[in-house]
Design a protein with these regions (language model features):
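Sequence/fold signature of self-assembling virion shell proteins
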Residues: 2-14, 25-48, 166-192, 196-204, ...
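Intrinsically disordered or highly flexible coil/loop and linker segments, enriched in small
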Residues: 22, 26, 51, 139-147, ...
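Assembly/oligomerization interface modules of large self-assembling protein complexes
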Residues: 31-111, 164
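Extracellular structured ligand-interaction cores
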Residues: 98, 105-107, 131, 229-231, ...
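Alpha-helical scaffold segments that mediate packing/assembly in large oligomeric complexes
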Residues: 114-212
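Phosphate-interacting basic helix/loop segments used at nucleotide- and nucleic-acid interfaces
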Residues: 212-221
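Beta-rich carbohydrate-recognition and catalytic domains
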Residues: 224, 235
């Protein structure tokens, strides 16, 4: 470590000790992070990701208890015939299911090599860069666990489970375990027999396109009082969005059609719902829900940390842990669709291709007519010359009518 790096790193360590109320020499021993510091760190973790800013990251006092829940679950309006002796009954404003939450320890341990610190020491914001690097990685790991976690291993294996599947059950796994009736992963007939082990999307498949699949899942798997919720979104990965919009851009287009394609792609909608692309989401799945239906609970006073300078390996080691859990607030406000198979597009036969070409020409003609109409409507009106308006010419009066003989 260079002299300048040592000076800036020591300043970072001094600041860390000051914030947590410990001596600088005790940072290599495990200490409890001050609650205010933990809150600040968790806020920075949330703010570092556009996705995390839209979900809940909530401190809870207990390791295990009931969930906080959404603002309102279900309906509360009712009628009661009190004159007939019936009593009015209140509805639970925020129904809590029996699952609850269970915060368990998750480690966020890492090391930074001396040569990396030497590079960062060239900048005036050395401490900010070091802090932000830690915060960003923790944020990405939490997203990865939330969408890929399936179980909790006593000792995790990053080589065997590169997507952190063995750290903790994530949101998708919670749906599989606690609300299987709201998970669609195969096609089942009315008699219960399995028609297809996959959800085939495309020509000749179970659904013509992703829009139909999302609409079907919304109508059949989500509770009726949530189906019309304007905050519902479709959470998915990059690949599904690419497969949906690729045909729009994989062709030569006139400027007008290219602009229309850009507009459609920029809106990013699936099944008439906004599509939200998040990192590390499974490529063959999508989750329909409100963003605030997903939460990360972290237990207060469980944030532990210590930093060690391991000169034998030319690096600084940071050991950090906190108790946390991934929570779905209300399973009725969501549906998980997975095991999606996108079928390859079938080649267009000559007759259909000719019809499509003809249809395309009609559309271009219509588009041109609309453009001309808009131009005409936008153009200033030309002044109209004054014209004497004459009434209908009077018929000649017969002399006899005048009284002539």
């Amino acid at each position: 470590m260079r002299k300048q790096t040592r000076f800036k790193f020591n300043a970072f360590m001094s600041r860390l000790a000051e914030l947590n109320g410990v001596d600088t020499g005790d940072l290599d021993k495990k200490f409890s992070v001050e609650p205010s510091v933990t809150q600040t760190i968790m806020t920075r973790v949330q703010d570092s990701s556009s996705f995390l800013t839209r979900i809940n990251i909530v401190p809870v006092p207990e390791m295990k208890a009931e969930k906080i829940g959404l603002d309102v679950s279900g309906t509360i309006a009712s009628n009661t015939d009190t004159a007939g002796g019936d009593e009015r009954e209140t509805a639970d404003f925020a129904t809590l299911d029996a699952e609850g939450y269970f915060c368990q320890q998750v480690n966020y341990d890492f090391h930074i090599r001396y040569n990396t610190l030497d590079l960062w020491a060239r900048y005036q914001d050395f401490q900010t860069r070091l802090r932000d690097a830690i915060v960003k990685r923790q944020a990405l790991d939490r997203i990865m666990i939330g969408f890929n976690g399936t179980h909790r291993a006593k000792t995790s294996n990053r080589v065997k489970f590169p997507l952190l599947q063995d750290i903790a059950p994530g949101w998708l796994q919670k749906y599989r375990e606690n609300a299987p009736s709201r998970v669609m992963n195969k096609v089942v007939a009315e008699d219960g027999s399995v028609v297809s082990e996959k959800l085939r999307v495309g020509a000749g498949g179970d659904y013509a396109n992703l829009d139909a699949l999302v609409m079907d899942a919304t109508n059949n798997l989500i509770a009726p009082w949530y189906q019309e919720d304007p905050e519902l979104v479709v959470i998915c990965g990059r690949q599904l969005l690419a497969d949906k919009y690729f045909p729009l851009v994989n062709q030569e287009q006139p400027n007008t059609e290219a602009m229309a394609a850009d507009l459609i792609i920029s809106q990013k909608r699936i099944g008439n719902l906004p599509a939200v692309r998040v990192p590390y989401f499974p490529a063959d799945a999508l989750l329909i829900t409100r963003m605030d239906n997903l939460s990360i609970y972290w237990q207060e006073d469980t944030h532990r940390r210590h930093m060690v300078e391991n000169s034998k390996r030319d690096r600084i080691e940071n050991y950090e842990s906190i108790n946390e859990d991934y929570v779905v607030e209300d399973y009725a406000c969501g549906a998980l669709v997975e095991n999606i198979e996108l079928l390859p597009a079938k080649p267009t036969d000559p007759q259909t291709k000719a019809a499509l070409t003809s249809s395309g020409e009609d559309i271009k003609t219509l588009a041109g007519a609309i453009v001309e109409a808009v131009k005409a409507a936008a153009a200033p009106a030309e002044p109209v010359a004054d014209v004497e308006v004459k009434g209908p010419e009077e018929a000649p009066v017969d002399d006899k009518v005048k009284g002539g003989k």
